Amino acid sequence: MKNLLHKIASAFVVCAALVAFTACNDDDGKVKKPQVSSELVGSYTPHYFKEVPDEWGGEPSRLYLEVAAAWTDPDNIPGIDLSESMGMPAGSFVMPFNTILDLVSAIGSQFVSSGLVQLDLHSDGLFAAKYHDVVVEEGADIMTTIFSPTFAEAVSVFPSAETAAVLPEGALSFYTESNLFFAAVSKDFIRAIEKQEGMEILSEIDKMLGAYKGLSVVSTDSHYAIPFKYTFEGGVLRLYVDRAMMLLYVKLLKDVLGGLGLDPSQMMGLDPAVILDDLFNATTELQIAVYLKKM
């Protein structure tokens, strides 16, 4: 069972982490480029949705990634017990979820505003991007990289010769349907990864979709796609997922985490499954949204 979950985790990460988009293919393997009829076709730059005043009178902070929640009991918001990580007795230092979500919004906003330069959604369903790579200093720990990221001055481009070896053009695409934005990945691209890595990915994804009924993943002969909700008003695209959409994946995520055999002693006393349950039980609404301004 653990090996199966490892395979499922690998397959799921490939699809979810690519966060993206697919093209349809001819029987001879050549990429078709059907036209996408969508109001979203165009070029975008990061857009902030909120300014937070600086308590010392400096420039306000701008937030580009929204993480918002409505709480079951606003006066008693639970949190995560970080006492063990601080070398303190259990229950001494509990960070409430609302503070944690604000922190996630602030950290994510750095990556959106400083990392992404431009996103292009093309009429053939493909996309392009200009961005700054995250610079990982030698010897830097992961927490430093996350909380205080450094970005390269040079602007990188996708697709390019440098990115083609990892993500060939046509592997990722998008389409809109029924007021949803679908991010999809080509099955031919996944087959290429299977051949290169000697892994069974497609079959494990299909097993996962069969085992976890109700997941919102769309599977066709050519691609897998994951839907996102969106609004488009005044030239601003708000791309988001809500609590109901996330809830579909909670059981899968908990099972995958359980199958990884994580050592509790290395998790600072934290149980990801319990944290997920506590968060969703404490909320009536939860949204994660990114804002983009059409150029």
Language model features with spans:
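A solvent-exposed, charged loop/short amphipathic helix patch at secondary-structure junctions
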Residues: 62-102, 256-276
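Contiguous, well-ordered beta-strand patches that form the walls/edges
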Residues: 83-252, 256
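General N-terminal leader/first-domain-start detector
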Residues: 25-27, 53-61, 83-89
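Short, exposed beta-strand-loop hairpins at the edges of beta-sheets
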Residues: 275-283
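Bacterial N-terminal signal peptides that target proteins for export
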Residues: 1-12
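Bacterial Sec-dependent N-terminal signal peptides
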Residues: 2-3, 17-47, 282-284, 288-295
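Flexible low-complexity loop/turn motifs enriched in small/helix-breaking residues
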Residues: 56, 115-116, 268, 286-288
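Tryptophan-anchored aromatic micro-motifs
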Residues: 36-76, 130, 292
